[in-house]
Structures are given as C-alpha cells and as structure tokens.
C-alpha cells in the first residue's frame, strides 16, 4: 500500500493538470496567422498601429515586428542589421505561422527616414508620400522575388493614426 499522502486539493490539482495535457496538441496545431505586420518603433503610434491592424479584422491574427523606419529597414544600407532582421522575420513568420501576407506600416515624420535621407529627406505632403512610396516599391519588388507566394500591403500613417494605402 502507498504511504503517499495526497489530500483532495492536491488530487484535484493533479487531475486538472493531467487533463490540460490533452489540450496541448490543439495548441501546437494552432500556429497559423494571416499576416506579418511590420511597423516602425515610434512610441507615438504604438496604439494607433494596433487599432489599425485590428480594424483590418486581424485581431490576434498577425505576427508583428517593429523596426525603425518599417519599410526602410528592409532596403536601406544605413541600417544593415535592421535590413537582415526585416527579411529574417518574414522568413521566420512564414516558417512558424504560415503567413500569407506582409503588411508594412510606415508613418509620417519618421526619424529613421530623416537619418537615412539626411538633407534629402522630404518632410511634408506629397513629397513625403512619394519618398515613402519609392522605398516601399523597393521592398515590394524584393518581396516578389524572394517570396512570390506572399501578398503585400503598404500603408503610410499620419501622426493622428489615420493610414492611407500606398501600394
């Protein structure tokens, strides 16, 4: 006969714990999300980024990585480690969570764009949009070459949280 002393509480805890193991295969299989969202690190837009993505009906259905400059991180030689991270995260998200789409969310008045472009930075209106669009087009072209199976969307967000689709 066993000399172990297990009271009712411990027995109940053991049964709950043992029962929860049956849920693990389902959790392991639930590793698919629709998209990878690549946003800028700017603290001013963290909440706006989340609201925007949730508004696209992606609530709990996307991976997210934040890199200075968002699209700029994917192609600028000014930030080589961010460049590698940009593409590594697409590869990882695709491998682990089988993403189907990449959503890139730049924003206006971006410090990373100011650093990368220096005196050539276009800070307002249509010129700023065109500068972001040119960078986004480079990312889109590279994405089409490296991951032709992934669709993409590119947005430019104002500091008030309103985003416009650029590509």
Give the residues covered by each predicted segment:
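Catalytic cores of secreted/periplasmic or lumenal enzymes
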Residues: 2-6, 30-34, 43-47, 84, ...
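Residue-level detector of alpha-helical recognition elements and their boundaries
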Residues: 26-27, 52, 119
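N-terminal secretory signal peptides and thylakoid transit peptides that target proteins
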Residues: 2-19, 25
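Short HxH-centered metal-ligating active-site micro-motif
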Residues: 60-123
